[in-house]
Amino acid sequence: MFRRWLIGSVPVLVVVVLLGTGTFYLMKARTFQLAGHVVSRVHTDARVVALTLDDGPSDRAPEVLKVLADAQVPATFYLNGRDLAAHPEHGRAIAAAGHEIGNHTYTHRRMVFVTPGTVRDEVEGTDAEIRKTGYAGPITFRPPYGKKLWTLPHYLAEHDRVTVTWDVEPDSGRADATADDIVAETLGKVRPGSIVLLHVMHGHADPSIAAIPRIVAELRAAGYEFVTVSDLMSR
């Protein structure tokens, strides 16, 4: 009898494994979601690229803003509502410098297996903090870690908002990456319409910050123009 039960349970186990695997890949997919629209890059022949900077703002913001100003390059900052509330002066400085500000949720939690109410609070609370900075432009949205399943995409679709991911991430999960590594990977992967993700606000951010002027100089020499995410999506 046990043998019969074991044989009968195999198809069930296979289905469970397949569902689990499918859910895992769906959560981390950069180019697909179950509802609404997701953008990892814009398909264009024009040599345009968007530089995006995730998390914060933190006390590194003044240094990052100086690097961007010296390079005369626009960026899209995906900021957390909690950090904006804690460091309103940095949010105001980012807005005053003319950069685009995007929504990266309030608490930077993984937005999977969450309730509609949680999604609403995470998104709308951050929108409110962004507007307090004086920023009046479009607010695009990026999920923390790029993770989403059903509730988040459904909410964004209902509110006519796009999920913005990326196609170049040279410093993600690489605590030992040097500025040389980050520059080399970026230059090797950028294509017309690329969205580049860097982390410059927390942790091991020095190499990423140091890489920005070199990335900008090299890509401009190759004929690229830097634009904000909303500008890129309007192409």
Task: List the predicted regions and their residue ranges.
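Terminal accessory/targeting
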Residues: 1-51, 58, 66-76, 188, ...
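Active-site beta->alpha N-cap acidic-glycine motif
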Residues: 27-114, 118-132, 138, 234
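A cross-domain feature marking catalytic cores of carbohydrate-active enzymes
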Residues: 53, 79-81, 103-105, 143-145, ...
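CE4/NodB-like, metal-dependent polysaccharide N-deacetylase domain
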Residues: 66-76, 100, 116-149, 154-158, ...
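Short histidine/acidic/glycine/proline-rich micro-motifs that form metal-
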Residues: 81-84, 107-110, 147, 169-173, ...
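Short, solvent-exposed loop/turn segments at secondary-structure boundaries
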Residues: 113-117, 175-178, 206-209
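Charged helix-capping and loop-helix junction motifs
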Residues: 120-123, 178-183, 209-213
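His/Asp/Glu-enriched short active-site or ligand-binding loop at hydrolase and phosphoryl-transfer sites
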Residues: 147-189, 223-234
